[in-house]
Amino acid sequence: KTTITRLVNGLIPQFYQGELQGRVLVDGQEISSRPMYQIAAKVGSVFQNPRTQFFNVDTDSEIAFGIENEARPPQELIERVEQTADDLRIQKLRNRNIFELSGGEKQKIAFASVYAMNPQIYLLDEPSSNLDMTSIQELREHLRLIKKQGKTVLIAEHRLYYLMELADRIVYLEKGEIKGIYTPEEF
């Protein structure tokens, strides 16, 4: 399942080697032919271990990082960080040292950094793995929010119970093969 997310966000074959058969299309364009900056503008990824995607020590800088890379004006950075914190209700995590956060709080900041960039596609790899029950409920609300915004969401996940009312389709994989595609009702 992680391999699929790495294909969609362009990490395979650009950063992870292997034999690639077939094509991965996003908006009708083959991912392997697009430069990473174009993919990153369209596809936002939240990895299972959020520490692997952090580039800053404090939470506000981390949330702003992707926007800064788009060379946005400073005032827009400030506004987007504030709007993200408001939309996701994570004000209590602002201006904190990332190394002092719990695993679940780090996951929330990783999600917020992607949300601030406003991608069309969200890729989440095991987003509930570091979360307690309350945080899983918050994650569900965040997913409901981005779905309402018309975003595409692809989630690689073992825990499905919290996604059943949100999912349009569930793709069941076993040993790297698609064994079935279901609606939540069929699953």
Descriptions of predicted regions:
Residues 75-93:
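Conserved ABC ATPase "signature" region
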Residues 97-101, 105:
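Conserved ABC ATPase signature
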Residues 157-158:
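H-loop/switch region of ABC-family ATPase nucleotide-binding domains
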Residues 111-112:
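Hydrophobic anchor residue at the start of the ABC signature
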Residues 23-38:
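ABC ATPase NBD Q-loop/coupling interface
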Residues 122-125:
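Catalytic Walker B motif of ABC-type/P-loop ATPase nucleotide-binding domains
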